[in-house]
Design a protein with these regions (language model features):
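Short, basic/polar, glycine-containing "phosphate-handling" surface segments that engage DNA
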Residues: 1-189, 244-284, 293, 513, ...
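SAM-dependent nucleic-acid methyltransferase catalytic core
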Residues: 3-8, 12-13, 29-45, 52, ...
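Polybasic, glycine- and aromatic-enriched phosphate-binding surface used to engage nucleic acids
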Residues: 50, 66-74, 90, 524, ...
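Signature of N6-adenine DNA methyltransferases within the class I
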Residues: 87, 98-141, 190-198, 202-210, ...
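Preference for the N-terminal adenyl/adenosyl cofactor-binding alpha/beta module
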Residues: 114, 118-364, 393-402, 440-448, ...
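Flexible phosphate/Mg2+-sensing switch loops adjacent to catalytic phosphate-binding sites
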Residues: 193-198, 324-343, 365-389, 410-432
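Flexible, glycine/threonine-enriched loop-and-boundary segments that flank and lead into catalytic domains
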Residues: 269, 295, 329-346, 433, ...
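Non-catalytic DNA-recognition/assembly elements of restriction-modification systems
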Residues: 352, 708-716, 821-919
């Protein structure tokens, strides 16, 4: 179930007569509990409640209370030992009249009438594996409205298949935007009479729905016709009550899709919702997926929370406006100057979606302007901040439509909030006729033509707002000469997930600038164009982006050329989790990076709730000089060579579980000579066991004598022949071997390719000469043990985390980026002896806790004291080699490592990642 299906199920449950015995199970069913789970809870097999309730382990403890005893029941649930033992996330008590619940992790409490509990369904979304931000959890209206509109959209498509074609898709999307406006307008007195639109459709159309589209067409036509022209236009008398809207929202075709009885019912139900509660930023981001067949199942996936949007907007320009407001105090002249400045500010989102960033920027600026007007004694003054100064580019037409509509709604709501409903209504209609959101490809549109510093070369004013061609990219500004701030959350899309078209777009942009782009994220194009915009103007830009653009190889590939445009990073937000409404969404690790033309101004680094002024910010988001770490083919410190492990690409046919190995040896004992222990990241960290078939070229025929081995070789062959990669197909005949073999037959230090960021150290291991390392490990063969101490140090972890990048938040290791670039002072024999002893102590401490695995031993909350002491001693010895003492913190560690890296590579030619090399 997704959030919208859950909301419908919960609403249905609340409308049914209350059944005390069945409620707990119906509640869990609404959140997606399976029949087998419910059956076992009903029978008592898994229900471990100790107070006569229903307890679902790790989820919720529910108690149906006697009438009037809900508060006491909630207390009993909270103090219940079973609640604690089962690690329940929630407790819930109800008597069918009152409803109380508590989130045991946050302490957040719900108290309401039973019939109103569906309004808080977002509170319980974690029960369905949906983790999301507070704003969405509390926005039950937006979820409900989007879910209902989605059902209507699907039903209309079913009855009007021609409206789903590319030829008419835009008309369908435009129709949905018109409906949303009508629902909002009838509940906010814009239509002067509550439920005017819904009531008119219900009263004037037949219950069999045969003429529903005709009635709606007449209403739309009325709203596109001035009062004096309505008689000649043949507007029905009953439609004359609708105002003239203008703005192009109802211009052009007034065709309406045919409604079935089901679609008509959906429409009337949607009209019955309270549209005054709409949040244009939340609703817009949810509704934009309705018109996308591929995304309809993940409504809400585009939402960026207000706190995360403000991580961009506040340091970009809003903080400065608030500081100037504070400085102005009650000085009328200073307040007037600030208001004048704000009226000329342009906010430009070149990947605006449904307008989240633009809407929040507008609302925040209106809040500041309202305070200015209040201090000047002009609280009801009309806003001087025009919507036309909020610009956007959006690839798809429906989100572009919704972005325009969201801004209109935000303007009206702001007028009501700061000036009163009377003034807001007096000036709302007819809508302004200017266009401010362009539908098109941001990588193909000239941003300066859309949002130039002093207007545009081609000044085109449209006849109306929504009738303007969505591809129009040259629109003049109402206020010229102001500041421009670019912002947004452009598409990330890693290099391996880009389409051919997206690759071509990057090629068109970067080839002419000499930037090797094949391993760059898609969002790098937005940073490039923003930097060019800043270079040519006095603009500034800030984008939310995955942290990968400030880590690993992308720093070396992108940032040197980008910073040569005479721009600088002037603020950055340290990595944080960005989550949306998608089910089982763990979130993406993001950063915010702010760019401007070099000007010597202040720079800031934000992390958690702290703000730190720094002297510089490099592309790794560190207070250090601009250093770019490329791939190195060998260790700059002269350490022994580290290779990637051996890659099977075998369809799983050369790898055996312990049980498969036992079965094979039971039937073919002679096959034991062809089996070896196999180690990847999971085997090293979690202590798992696997084996592989390892056959030399001169042993193939002998191995094939074992039937199961021969069968497995044939499966490997078929798997490789079916591959899309020619290099893999060529190796189909070598089906007895791993496809890439680096080295084997020697003892090795191994380092996992990916490991948890929660551990204080990268969990290195050792394998024996008869054991095989997979490509999920990096290996140093026949090593000296002091290298184990270096790789197991805090210093090495901090370096790798910074220059190699991350997979989500996990540490992603690289030999060519992390190990080979790690700088070391010259080690004396005594240094090596001391480090060898440290490595031995770490290994002995691990051995003392056998059979505990690495994952358990290196859990930061459970790490044994002797193992921690061994690592502390290792860090002490290694760090003393650098500076004669322990480093005070990770910042000091990185500063020293970057300084030493710069010295060790100064004047040396770099074998970068642009040169093919053996890993």
């Amino acid at each position: 179930l997704n959030a919208f299906e859950i909301e419908e199920a919960i609403s249905s449950l609340a409308e049914q007569p209350f059944d005390a015995s069945d409620f707990p199970f119906l509640f869990l069913q609404a959140f997606g509990a399976k029949e087998t789970t419910l059956r076992r809870l009903r029978s008592g097999d898994t229900n471990k409640s100790d107070i006569g309730g229903v307890l679902q382990t790790t989820n919720i403890h529910i108690k149906v209370a006697a009438t009037g005893a809900v508060t006491d029941a909630l207390k009993d649930l909270k103090s219940s030992p079973a609640t604690s033992r089962a690690k329940a996330k929630f407790i819930l008590a109800t008597d069918g009249l009152d409803f109380q619940a508590e989130d045991l992790n946050t302490g957040e409490v719900i108290v309401c009438e039973y019939r109103k509990f569906p309004e808080f369904f977002g509170f319980f979304l974690p029960l369905a594996g949906i983790s999301t931000v507070k704003q969405i959890r509390e926005s039950s209206f937006d979820i409900k409205a989007t879910g209902r509109l989605n059902r209507l959209y699907v039903e209309l498509q079913k009855d009007n298949p021609e409206w789903s074609t590319s030829a008419r898709r835009h008309e369908m999307n435009h129709f949905m935007a018109r409906l949303i406006f009508c629902f909002f307008a009838e509940d906010t007195d814009i239509f002067m009479k509550e439920t005017l639109f819904t009531a008119t459709v219900e009263q004037m159309s037949s219950k069999d729905s045969s003429d529903t589209h005709v009635v709606i067409e007449a209403i739309f036509k009325a709203m596109n016709t001035r009062s004096e022209d309505r008689a000649s236009a043949g507007i029905p008398r009953w439609a004359n009550v609708f105002p003239y809207v203008n703005g192009g929202l109802f211009s052009g075709s007034t065709d309406v899709p045919v409604f079935s009885k089901i679609a008509r019912t959906y429409l009337l139900h949607i009209g019955g919702l309270d549209w005054k509660k709409i949040n244009p930023d939340i609703f817009g981001s949810m509704i934009q997926a309705v018109a996308d067949d591929d995304e309809r199942g993940s409504l809400g996936m585009h939402y960026t929370s207000v706190p995360n949007i403000l991580k961009v907007l506040n340091p970009l320009f809003l903080d400065d406006l608030r500081e100037k407001l504070e400085e102005a105090g009650d000085n009328p002249r200073k307040l007037l100057n600030l208001r004048s400045r704000m009226s000329k500010i342009r906010v430009f989102d070149p990947a605006c979606g449904s307008g989240n960033f633009l809407v929040i920027a507008y609302k925040q600026m209106r809040e500041i302007e309202a305070e200015i007007n209040k201090r000047r004694g002009e609280p009801e003054r009309r806003s001087e901040i025009p919507l036309t100064n909020f610009r956007g580019i959006e690839l798809r037409d429906f989100p572009a439509e919704i972005a325009r509509l969201a801004l209109i709604i935000a303007e009206y709501q702001s007028d009501v909030l700061y000036r009163g409903q009377k003034e807001a209504l007096a000036e709302f209609l007819p809508l302004d006729s200017k266009n401010w959101v362009t539908c098109g490809n941001a990588l193909e549109i000239d941003w300066l033509s859309l949002c130039g510093p002093t207007g545009t070369g081609v000044k085109i004013r449209s006849k109306d707002l929504f009738g303007t061609p969505l591809h129009q990219a040259e629109i003049d500004f109402e206020n010229e000469g102001g500041e421009t701030y670019m912002c947004g959350n452009p598409p990330y899309i890693g290099s391996s997930k880009q389409t051919k078209e997206q690759k071509n777009e990057l090629a068109n942009l970067f080839n002419r600038n000499g930037v090797k782009f094949k391993n760059l994220d898609y969002i790098s194009a937005w940073f490039w164009l923003a930097a060019e915009f800043c270079r040519l103007t006095q603009a500034a830009a800030a984008f939310v982006t995955t942290n990968s653009i400030c880590q690993g190889e992308q720093v070396f590939l992108l940032w040197p050329a980008l910073l040569r445009k005479d721009v600088e990073i002037f603020f950055a937000q340290a990595p944080f989790k960005w989550a949306n409404l998608a089910q089982n969404n763990a979130g993406v690790t993001c950063v915010v990076v702010g760019l401007r033309r070099k000007n010597g101004g202040k720079k800031y680094l934000f992390f958690e709730d702290q703000k730190k002024e720094v002297t510089r910010l490099n592309p790794y988001l560190l207070d250090f000089d601009d250093v770019f770490i490329p791939r190195h083919s060998e260790s700059i410190a002269g350490l022994p060579r580290m290779l990637k492990g051996n890659q099977p690409t075998d369809g799983g046919n050369l790898i055996l579980s312990p049980e498969e190995r036992r079965n094979l040896l039971a039937s073919s004992p002679d096959a034991s000579r062809f089996l070896r222990p196999l180690y990847g990241s999971k085997e090293i960290i979690d202590g798992l066991q696997r084996y592989c078939i390892w056959v030399e070229d001169d042993e193939v025929e002998e191995a094939k004598a074992t039937t199961e081995l021969a069968v497995r070789f044939e499966k490997v062959k078929q798997s490789r022949l079916e591959s899309g990669a020619e290099s893999t197909r060529k190796r189909a005949l070598d089906s007895h071997r791993f496809i890439q073999i680096q080295e084997y037959g020697k003892a090795a230090i191994v380092v996992p390719e990916v490991s948890s960021e929660k551990r204080g150290y990268i969990p290195c291991g050792l394998i024996k000469s008869n054991e095989i390392a997979t490509n999920k490990l990096f290996a140093i063969y026949e090593p000296k043990l002091f290298v184990f101490a270096i790789c197991s140090s805090r210093l090495h972890r901090v370096w790798v985390e910074t220059v190699c990048g991350k997979l989500e938040e996990r540490i992603s290791y690289s030999n060519v980026l992390g190990y080979n670039t790690f700088s070391l002072p010259n080690l004396t024999e005594k240094n090596k002896t001391d480090l060898t002893r440290c490595a031995e102590d770490i290994l002995l401490a691990r051995e003392a806790h056998f059979p505990a695995n690495i994952a358990h031993l290196y859990d930061p909350e459970k790490m044994p004291a002797d193992l921690k002491a061994a690592h502390d001693r290792n860090d002490e010895v290694l760090e003393a080699i650098y500076i004669g003492r322990r480093f005070r913190n990770d910042t000091e560690r990185l500063e020293k490592l970057f300084e030493l890296y710069t010295k060790m590579t100064s004047g040396k030619p770099t074998k970068s990642g642009n040169i093919k090399m053996k890993a």
